[in-house]
């Protein structure tokens, strides 16, 4: 279970501070949680605070009873928190197969790696040996990143606006991926989205 106690975050803006989050108290023990709302509401900031990418100005974060407030993003990842960025990172020199294998944390075969790609709507044979570089579109990178999260199968998987950059892949297929993930993993899924239709998974 994830618990946030009195979480606040202030961003510096010149000589002043802008309050992004204020006294957030939240418990997440459900299988699926979605934060929806307009731009600038602090949704992505809250997700990054949970993942350890941003340090809160005030408050504490607990994961399964352990205070993880001071832990780095790497340490939180080791404890079972995955984070999928709104704009996925490119890795020149690393193939899609390599990336999925690294994400899984174990040696996996081609067929298993391909199965993760198929689950996110990619033709595995066209992508498995490609480099994760600028030759891939934003939508392709997004789907590959979701495949790595599926491979990790962590206790808490956070997706920051997963629909961003997906042009040719329908939103309905994206929802189908999360529905499948919801059935397969034992952990919780936290999605940040502008699309209220994502709530249909819950």
Predicted segments with their positions:
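Conserved structural motif at the start of ABC-family nucleotide-binding domains
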Residues: 2, 19-23
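The feature captures the beta-strand-to-loop junction immediately N-terminal to the Walker
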Residues: 36-39
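Helix-to-loop junction immediately C-terminal to a conserved catalytic motif
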Residues: 51
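Conserved ABC transporter NBD signature motif
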Residues: 59-66, 79, 112
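ABC ATPase NBD coupling module
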Residues: 67-82
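Q-loop/switch helix immediately C-terminal to the Walker
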Residues: 87, 93-109
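ABC ATPase C-loop
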Residues: 149-150
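Walker B catalytic motif
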Residues: 161-162, 169
């Amino acid at each position: 279970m994830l618990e946030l106690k009195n979480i606040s975050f202030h961003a510096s803006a010149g000589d002043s501070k802008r309050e992004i989050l204020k006294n957030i108290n939240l418990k997440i023990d459900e299988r699926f949680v979605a934060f929806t709302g307009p731009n600038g509401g602090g949704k992505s900031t809250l997700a990054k605070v949970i993942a350890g990418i941003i340090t809160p100005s005030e408050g504490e974060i607990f994961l399964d009873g352990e205070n993880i407030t001071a832990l780095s993003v790497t340490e939180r990842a080791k404890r079972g928190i995955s984070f999928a960025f709104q704009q996925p990172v490119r890795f020149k020199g690393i193939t899609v197969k390599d990336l999925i294998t690294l994400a899984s944390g174990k040696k996996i075969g081609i067929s298993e790696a391909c199965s993760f790609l198929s689950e996110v709507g990619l033709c595995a044979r066209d992508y498995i040996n490609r480099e994760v570089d600028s030759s891939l579109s934003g939508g392709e990178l997004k789907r590959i990143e979701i495949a790595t999260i599926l491979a990790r199968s962590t206790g808490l998987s956070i997706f920051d606006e997963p629909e961003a950059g997906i042009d040719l892949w329908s939103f309905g297929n994206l929802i189908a991926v999360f529905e499948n993930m919801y059935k397969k993993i034992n952990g919780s899924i936290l999605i940040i989205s502008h699309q209220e239709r994502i709530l249909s998974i819950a």
